C-alpha cells in the first residue's frame, strides 16, 4: 500500500519538569555516555575539570585506545558556532584527536559552516550527533525497537 506522505522518525527526550538545567544536562550526559559504552567506549570521566575547562565526557575507544572528547548540549535552540568552536579549542588544548558533539537540536547556519571548516582539518576528527544520529545509535544498540514503516497502520497520518 502506497503512503501519501513519508514517515519521519524523531527523537524526543523527556525529563521531569522539576529538573533544573543542571539536572537536565547531567541526564543527557549520562544518556550519551550509555550510547558510547554500547559502541565500545570506556567512560574515563564525566564533568572533568582540567586547566580551567569542563569536559562533559572523556572516553576511550577500547579496540583502538583512541581518546574521545565529548560535548553534550541538551537545549531547544539551535547550536551556535561558539559551541562548535569551544569543543574544538578544548580538544586541541587537551591534544585529543577525536571530538563528538551530541545535541538534540540542529546546528545553526554559522555552526554548520564552522563544523565543515573543522572537518577539513586533518589533525582532528570532529563528529556531530543530532537527534537523528542519536536515534540511529540507540536503535543500533537495541535500547529501543525500530518499528518498520510497513508495520505502522495506514490510519495514522502526519
Can you name each region flagged by the protein language model?
Residues 1-158:
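Mixed-charge (Asp/Glu-Lys/Arg
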Amino acid at each position: 500500500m502506497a503512503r501519501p506522505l513519508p514517515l519521519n522518525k524523531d527523537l524526543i527526550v523527556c525529563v521531569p519538569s522539576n529538573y533544573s538545567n543542571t539536572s537536565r544536562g547531567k541526564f543527557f550526559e549520562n544518556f550519551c555516555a550509555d550510547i558510547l559504552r554500547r559502541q565500545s567506549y570506556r567512560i574515563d570521566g564525566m564533568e572533568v575539570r582540567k586547566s580551567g575547562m569542563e569536559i562533559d565526557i572523556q572516553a576511550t575507544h577500547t579496540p583502538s585506545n583512541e581518546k574521545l572528547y565529548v560535548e553534550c548540549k541538551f537545549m531547544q535552540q539551535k547550536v551556535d558556532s561558539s559551541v562548535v568552536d569551544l569543543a574544538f579549542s578544548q580538544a586541541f588544548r587537551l591534544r585529543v584527536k577525536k571530538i563528538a558533539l551530541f545535541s538534540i537540536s540542529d546546528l545553526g547556519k554559522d555552526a554548520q559552516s564552522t563544523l565543515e571548516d573543522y572537518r577539513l582539518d586533518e589533525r582532528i576528527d570532529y563528529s556531530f550527533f543530532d537527534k537523528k544520529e542519536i536515534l540511529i545509535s540507540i536503535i543500533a544498540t537495541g535500547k529501543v525497537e525500530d518499528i518498520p514503516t510497513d508495520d505502522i497502520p495506514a490510519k495514522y497520518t502526519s
